Amino acid sequence: MLMYRRDFLKSVTAAWVAFGLPNPLGGAFATNRVIPLRRLGQSQRFDYEWLKERARALAATPYHSRKRVLPTPLERLSWDQYQSIRYRQDHALWADSDAHFQVKFFHLGLYFHSPVRMYEVVDGMAQELAYDPAAFDYGSSGLNGKGLPKDLGFAGFRLNTRKDIDRDFAAFLGASYFRAVGQEGQYGQSARGLAVNTGSSGPEEFPDFIAYYLEQPTADADTVVMYGLLDSPSIAGAYRFSITHADVLRMDIDSALYPRETIERLGIAPCTSMYQVGENDRRMGWDWRPEIHDTDGLFLWTGNGEWIWRPLCNPLHLRFNMFLDNNPRGFGLLQRDRDFDHYQDDGVFYEKRPCLWVEPKHGWGEGSVQLVEIPTFDETFDNIVAFWNPRNKPHPGQELLFGYRLYWGAFPPVSSSLAYCVATRTGLGGVVGQKRKYFSWRFAVDFVGGKLAALARVHDVSVEPVLHMTRGRPEIVSARPLHEIRGYRVMFDVVPLEDSAQQIDIRLYLRDTNGEPLTETWLYQWVPPILEERKY
């Protein structure tokens, strides 16, 4: 599907808003009676190799869209009406087994016009699951299901456990989007199967998962295995997911990609998030809540072992960054700020939003982690994307194999022995009480962990900030213990060039007297105001 990102995400982001909350109708559907889903056609042999061949064959044929014209009542549903349509517990897949997991399906309608074929895999045999209007409770939608086509199909699905039938822990809905939660039980950012031409000059392509194959788990399995067939105008692909439900939910993913066309910018393991306003960027801070974001930074563990933290921003114009690397060890969008007082939102609980960490399972070679930041006026628009972009552009006839793990939870599964950044604050520079003679911008960066807690208690110790910037000049640079956080605060002003409003790239870390780093590397991009708007 080809379209402009903002138009597409107006629909998909809004549709994700309430997912992950307890199903208010779930208890009404919880009965001892289970109604098995109807199957279509004959079962057929299935494994991942078969699916890869299916994707390869798709890529060798012209693409055709699977979007369908829905009945008018489904097209005209409001969000509240659509959200009231719930899958009945007595129709849940595997509800009639001893499996730890169950599957419930999403209805087509509102923004979701592309039916996704669903298959169950049992003992290496796959059989398609039939859509049944009777499997849904239509709530306050105004629909009763009787007038809907019998072959309408499904929009997606969600996973829950037998012990908690009202709350799902993972959901796949819309294009190749999916989400999961950790111990906090709160949805936040999304992942995608693939990103195509994100942040490029033309329209972005949103590949679709056109079929899912759900493997029936055994009674004692703590992992559910599923497969996805992906298709788009420029590429097809086969995916294998192994999802382990735990406090930090883990997805082991293998993907095989088959380009139809040469692709300008291919995004592997894309993470999609939202950042409107935070401690470091209050440009869109007209809301009564102090901070509004799903995540507050991009975290990188590079192939050469460097740990990098890049705070997110809500820029005035689209901003695109490349972090060149060779065989990256991991990257992800994190929500480090876990303090409710910093958000004050008791409805969506931003402090509980999960981090998403990407861990390659084998060497990915040369390429870059790419970060796209898009201006947004409100929290309903996902404006942050991060993904891996291979150095070589994919071409038709290739098979591209990528294996990786996704971790969803309050913290990533890896950490360094170095101190890490917990806050970045910005504001007008200069010395309080003294007249300012020129414009400057203040940065206050807080680090905790590592050796800093011990060093903060010692008076005769030298901790040196190492600061670099691409233009302008730094002044009033300091690094001092901050006992309230058992760490250090680095403060400095940036004085931009008088005749330039060009972006300034800033790089900072702390080191000891032996020149050894004490902290991860902090990166930032700041665009000074034009000369006429520099108020001091």
Curated annotation (Swiss-Prot):
Query: According to the lineage, what is the superkingdom?
Result: Bacteria
Q: Write the signal peptide boundaries.
A: 1-30
One GO BP annotation of this record: beta-glucan biosynthetic process
Q: Name one GO molecular function term.
A: catalytic activity
Q: Does the keyword Hydrolase apply?
A: no
Q: Which keywords does UniProt give here?
A: Periplasm, Signal
User: Major location, coarse class?
Assistant: periplasm
InterPro entries (UniProt xref): Gal_mutarotase_sf_dom (IPR011013), GH-type_carb-bd (IPR014718), Glucan_biosyn_MdoD (IPR023724), Glucan_biosyn_MdoG/MdoD (IPR014438), Glucan_biosyn_MdoG_C (IPR007444), Ig-like_fold (IPR013783), Ig_E-set (IPR014756), TAT_signal (IPR006311)
Instruction: Identify its protein family.
Output: Belongs to the OpgD/OpgG family.
The protein here is known as Glucans biosynthesis protein D
Q: Which organism is it from?
A: Xylella fastidiosa (strain Temecula1 / ATCC 700964)
